[in-house]
Amino acid sequence: MIADLAGLIAPLSVGAFREHLAQRVPLLLRSDGDVATLLDWDSFFDAALGDDFPARRLRVTKEARQLPTVFYRHRGRVKRDAIAKVMEAGGSVIAYDLHRFVPALARLVASAEAEIGEHIVGAAIAGTGEHGALPAHYDDGDLLIIQIAGRKRWVVHADPMIDPVVGAPQVRSDAAPVPLLDTMLAPGDMLLLPAGYRHHCMVAAERSLHVGLFFYPLTAPRVLDLMMRAMFESPAARHPIRGDADMDAALEAALRQQLLERIERLSLAELRAAHRTVALPEGLA
C-alpha cells in the first residue's frame, strides 16, 4: 500500500524528486507499484459524483470539449445515468481537489506537502475516448501524473510557457508544435510534467484512469495574493482612499507606509505555511 510520497516515487528519493522539480524538465518514471490502493474506477466515481463534491471542481468532456452542466446536472445533483452515457460514448470525467474526498489521496497529498513544502492539489481523470479529455494545453502547476488503470499516450511539446501565473488564461504559442516526448503510460508509470509544458493525451485502451498531483511553489504573485487576503481582515486596510488632488501626496505617503509595514513584517516561514493551507486563486485549470 502506498502511504506517502517516498513510497510512491521509490526508488527515486524525495531529495532527488525535489531536485527534478527545481530543474523544470519532464521526467518519466517507470514503476509497477500498487497504485490501485490510491484510487480505482469505482472509488473515483463514488467521490467525484457524490452530493458533497463541489460542482465547480467537476468537468465532463467529450472529444476534448467541455459539456454544459445542463447535460449531466439536475437541481444541483449529478445525473449518474447521463454520466454513464457520456462515458459509453467516449467521454471523460475530470475531478479537481479530489484528494479532499478520497482518504488515500488525502494522505498522499499531506505527505507530499510536508516533504516538499508547497501547495498541492490532487485531481484525477477517468476517460474512455481516444480524443482525450482536453485539447492540447499547459498546466499552471508542476504536475505528477500517476497512471492508475488502463494505458494512456502522452505527447509533450518542446515549447513551454515559462512560469505561468496561477489562474491566468492560457497563452497561445505561435510556434508549430514539436514533440519533446511521446510515451505510453501503463499502470504504475508516472510522468513529472513541469508547469507550462503544452501536452495532450489519448486513451490507448478501453478506458483509462490517472491521478494528477499539482505542485504549486510559492511565488511573488502568490505572496501578494496572501497579503491581500490578510488585508481583507483589517478595517484600516479596507478604508477608502479618498481626497482632493491637493491631498495626493499625503495619501500616497500613508499608503506606502501601510504597505511597507506589511512587507517588513513578512516571514517566509509564515508565508509558506499560509501558502500550503489557503486556497489558490480561482481559475485553476
Question: What feature does the model see in each segment?
Answer:
Residues 148, 183-204:
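Conserved metal-binding segment of the jelly-roll/cupin
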Residues 1-126, 242-247, 256-285:
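Transition-metal
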Residues 38-39, 134-138, 146, 202:
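Short histidine-centered beta-strand/loop micro-motifs
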Residues 126-129, 139-160, 173, 216:
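Short, conserved beta-strand element in jelly-roll/cupin
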Residues 117, 141-142, 161-165, 171, ...:
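A short alpha->loop->secondary-structure connector
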Residues 152-187:
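A short beta-strand-loop-beta hairpin characteristic of the jelly-roll/cupin
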Residues 1-10, 174-184, 200-285:
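Fe(II)/2-oxoglutarate
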